[in-house]
């Protein structure tokens, strides 16, 4: 996605750039494991979180000034069985 150079992901996270309030907040809800990873409902849970962020309704998890949100979800084993990979980008209009 181009957030940092190859190999710089660790230092980026260590500097706090992926935390709430950082330059690129990642998983402010705690991610899929914090939700019990409900498999079939995973994508919907991700979209719900992103919608809450864009509406400014995420409470203590709120990312300040959220205008664009990216969701990635996949299922199955690509190349071995039927699988799917989806990337959704949501953007606040006003």
What are the language-model segments listed below?
Residues 1-94:
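Claisen-condensing/thiolase-fold acyl-transfer catalytic domains that form or cleave C-C bonds
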């Amino acid at each position: 996605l181009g957030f940092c150079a190859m190999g710089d992901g660790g230092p980026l996270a260590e500097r706090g750039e992926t935390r709430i309030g950082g330059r690129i907040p990642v998983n402010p809800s705690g991610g899929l494991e914090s939700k019990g990873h409900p498999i079939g409902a995973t994508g919907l849970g991700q979209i719900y979180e992103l919608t809450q962020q864009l509406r400014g309704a995420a409470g203590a998890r709120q990312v300040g000034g959220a205008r664009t949100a990216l969701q990635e979800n996949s299922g199955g084993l690509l190349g071995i069985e039927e699988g799917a990979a989806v990337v959704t980008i949501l953007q606040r209009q006003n």
